[in-house]
Amino acid sequence: KVFCVDLQLKMLEITEKRARRANLNSRMAFYRCEPDNLSIAEKVDFILSFWMVHEVNDQKDFFNQLPSNLNSGGKILIAEPKIHVTDGDFQQTLEIAQFSGLRICGQPAIRFSHAALFSKNEKKEQFP
């Protein structure tokens, strides 16, 4: 099952409409989150955060929530737009993610994006 989580109701409505047209809506669930809470309890095998982390007010809080939603062996792919996110800002995002209990396990090439693939780090450090 695919869980779609977004702060903007309009984005969820657009996604749900497209899913219905493609006859995929029975495989999907849609959740509106709060600005500081993902508001989802399900554990998943894969989390995709595409071109949105730079819009999060508190990246530490965001990344602290992700490991609890990830199944053992699960992965998280973060992609950020190069047009909005500098190399330095993306490096800072990677550091925050790592201190939140994630380990970089790859940096795939995604067009126009900075990207990193993460898994859970069993030896979680606390972010200061």
Regions found by a protein language model. Give the residues of each.
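Class I SAM-dependent methyltransferase SAM/SAH-binding core
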Residues: 1-38
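Short helix-capping segments at alpha-helix termini
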Residues: 20-25, 72-73, 101
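A short SAM/SAH-binding and catalytic strip from SAM-dependent methyltransferases
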Residues: 45-59
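A short glycine-rich, Lys/Arg-flanked "PGG" loop and its adjoining helix->strand segment in the class I
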Residues: 60-75
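Core SAM-dependent methyltransferase catalytic element
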Residues: 100-128
